[in-house]
Amino acid sequence: MFYKQDWILRQIQMIGEMISMAVFHKSIIAYENENVVSPTQTDRLYTRLDMLVANGKIGEAEDALFDEIDPDDPKYLELALDFYQKLNRLSDAELEKYDFPRQEILDGMNTLVELFGLSDLVK
């Protein structure tokens, strides 16, 4: 089981890095609020996702992400990559505690790839 989890963790990292380099020309994605005084829709979603994850509601956070995501706006891709990279940094014990297996993170990353038309990057 440990090897499978480790393999999934590396797959998530690799997919995130490939998308980051291809789309944003940087190896690490960290979403940054565009305007603290007048937050954008992605800024508000980012804050909401962070609060949900902090309260252990990871599944609800992922649902909110996909409810609001706009595949025509690269800011949503940046936000989603940041979201999944943060989840991937959680320990297996934390993910298990919140009933969110690491495989779901990989599934979410693969859904992003499809939504944003990036399948050719991740073959």
Task: Place the predicted regions along the sequence by residue.
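N-terminal alpha-helical interaction modules that lie
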Residues: M1-D73, R89-K123
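Short acidic/histidine-centered micro-motifs embedded in hydrophobic/aromatic stretches
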Residues: D67, D82-F83
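Short, well-ordered alpha-helical segments
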Residues: Y76-A80
